[in-house]
A protein has these predicted regions:
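Active-site-adjacent structural elements in enzyme catalytic cores
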Residues: 1-183
Length: 183
């Protein structure tokens, strides 16, 4: 499996429509750019239904403001939880994320505080789709060798940087209702 230690090279791999295993705050992730061919490849690798939503990662709050409809009353909440391991469901501003939004234009988005992931996202310069690096419906995989074996495909590379210390998936909240979807 191809490996990258440099965020710029890893971002170029993604921009070519390929799939990247990457560290997050808590779990190994696997992701791609918002592109129908890349999303189909990712879904096939994970054996995942394309109708199930993906999380979008962006490097900062400015990108969130640019891509999503945000009421000013939500700014304090978002400033308190981001950057960090909290994913927020919110409405997109336009159709730029239509490949990953639900019927109501909602998308799950996170501004990560994982140093290496933030660097990767900055070099990428566009939203990145991410999900846990496991087969859909199966247990999370923490061992990197097991992940490499599970996703051994010429279109998959590894951004080989340390995993965060959280050891679980991110919390997910709905910004409109403030309901916790996943703890």
């Amino acid at each position: 499996m191809k490996e990258f230690n440099c965020p710029e090279l890893a971002s170029n791999w993604l921009k070519a429509g390929k799939i990247l295993l990457h560290p997050t705050e808590g779990l190994w992730g696997i992701g791609c750019i918002v592109d129908s061919t890349a999303i189909n490849l990712l879904s096939n690798l994970k054996r995942r239904n394309n109708k199930k939503g993906y999380i979008i990662l962006v490097p900062n709050l400015e990108d969130v403001r640019r891509l999503f409809q945000l009421k000013p009353k939500y700014f304090p909440t978002l400033h308190n939880i981001w950057p960090g391991p909290v994913t927020v469901i919110m409405k997109t501003k336009n159709n730029s994320l239509s490949l990953v939004s639900d019927d109501n234009n909602n998308v799950a988005v996170r501004v990560s505080d994982h140093y290496h992931l933030k660097n990767l996202l900055t070099f990428l310069g566009q939203p990145m789709i991410s999900t846990s690096a496991n087969i859909s419906g199966k247990q999370n995989i923490f061992d990197l060798d097991d992940i490499r074996n599970t996703f051994n495909d010429p279109n998959v590379a590894l951004f080989n940087k340390p995993l965060g210390k959280l050891k679980k998936a991110s919390t997910i909240i709905d910004i409109e209702s403030m309901q916790i979807i996943r703890k």
